Amino acid sequence: MSESSSKSSQPLASKQEKDGTEKRGRGRPRKQPPVSPGTALVGSQKEPSEVPTPKRPRGRPKGSKNKGAAKTRKTTTTPGRKPRGRPKKLEKEEEEGISQESSEEEQ
């Protein structure tokens, strides 16, 4: 039984070598090495004079997890002194925040 299975796998491997395309497992295919523009054919290039646009990263940048609040909210501070850390909420600010939420619900 085991002999027949090993025989069947050998011809398949030889066919793949003849085709020139190696098929690996079901996982993600390997990234092809980048081809330098000097070795590529000049006739195959569509726009040789225009510089191709660089690829932009997808999704959220790595270091931007906790930076959203710093950009959106500007605090007024006394000149010459920079407060560090999270600002403390005053009781008045908390009450104003609650009243604003209730007024939005009514509209």
Curated annotation (Swiss-Prot):
Positions bearing Phosphoserine: 9, 36, 44, 49, 99, 102-103
Residue numbers carrying ADP-ribosylserine: 8-9
Modified residues annotated as Symmetric dimethylarginine in this record: 26
PTM statement from Swiss-Prot or TrEMBL: Constitutively phosphorylated on two or three sites. Hyperphosphorylated at early stages of apoptosis, followed by dephosphorylation and methylation, which coincides with chromatin condensation. Isoforms HMG-I and HMG-Y can be phosphorylated by HIPK2. HMG-Y is not methylated.
Asymmetric dimethylarginine PTM sites in chain numbering: 26, 58, 60
Subunit relationships: Interacts with HIPK2.
Protein name in the entry: High mobility group protein HMG-I/HMG-Y
Organism this protein belongs to: Homo sapiens
Taxonomic lineage of the native organism: Eukaryota, Metazoa, Chordata, Craniata, Vertebrata
This protein's encoding gene: HMGA1
